[in-house]
Amino acid sequence: RDYRGCVEWLIDAGIVNVCYCLSSPTLPLSGNCDVDKFKLYFCDTGLLVSLLDEESQDDLRSNKNLSVYKGALYENIVAEALVKSGYKLYYYRKDSGTLEEDFFLRTASNLVPVEVKAKNGNSKSLRALISSDKYSDIEFGFKLSANNIGYQDKIYTFPYFCTFLLKKYRKTFVPIKD
């Protein structure tokens, strides 16, 4: 079935933000996306939470059984903050499913993968993109998590609440040379 009209209505009504799939994690972003492959994020994470059943909403308020929803909620929160900072949303998923990155930003000369981690993980996809010679536009990445600000192995870590500062940081950014 074709849902294009419904999706366009949700976008035009300001209910969802669209995140397009990149054909390859390379520049330019807008010329490198497949408009038929996309994810939708709510413009207001409260709308996402309101769609949960009452028991699940109670779980969120009492901070239990959060692991089921945590990834989707944090990813939606970051998507919302990026859009409000003026970014268009792009993600990448390799057809084999072995590599997936949540978002991409652009600096003057680089493509920056952004990974949203709900749990402490090893950021396998982010590390693969940074270390691969195949993606020359990618020199470093950003990881958003519950952790503090940090840097290790070409990955800059920021707490979720710093998402709105990424645009300002990106403009004055000078990569650390390892």
Where are these regions (language model features)?
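Catalytic cores of nucleic-acid endonucleases
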Residues: 118-159
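Structural motif
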Residues: 110-112, 140
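Short catalytic-loop micro-motif centered on adjacent basic/acidic residues
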Residues: 91, 113-116
